[in-house]
Amino acid sequence: AILALSIDLIWGYCGILSLGHGAFFALGGYAMGMYLMRQIGSRGVYGNPVLPDFMVFLNYKALPWYWHGFDMFWFAALMVLLVPGLLAFCFGWLAFRSRVTGVYLSIITQAMTYALLLAFFRNDFGFGGNNGLTDFKDILGFNVQAQGTRAALFVLSCLALALAFLICRAIVTSKLGKVLIAIRDAE
């Protein structure tokens, strides 16, 4: 639902159809998934305290450099925001500096999404490939399978959705919102 809000803001109010929003949300989800995989430790199928199970299965000898730090929640939470934000900034800067608009921007954002899909689905990069990241055990010390944890995650998700809605509403009703509508109407 937060993804839908973001698409509504950029497409409905700015008139910019970006098909890359899913990729940015997936990057954030993968960052949190990497944290959850690091929390499994020796409780995994192969009992390796350092490597996630899929890396043991694929004969990795050491943890890739970009997995370091994901054993700490604060680092993973920072990466959830930072990695997609930096990619969106770089991609947006290049696209808008080149004055790519309309259907061409939509095609380029879809191509970026597909490129990320291919990168994450290859087992060569250490992201789990087609198997993805599975068998999560706990988050912040709470069992992910417990009903209480699931209920708390649901409530937190609802609160995040409500906050995102309020932020989008504040943007739309502000002077910035009028500028966004003017950008859309000028096209």
Predicted regions and their residues:
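Transmembrane alpha-helices and adjacent helix-loop boundaries
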Residues: A1-E187
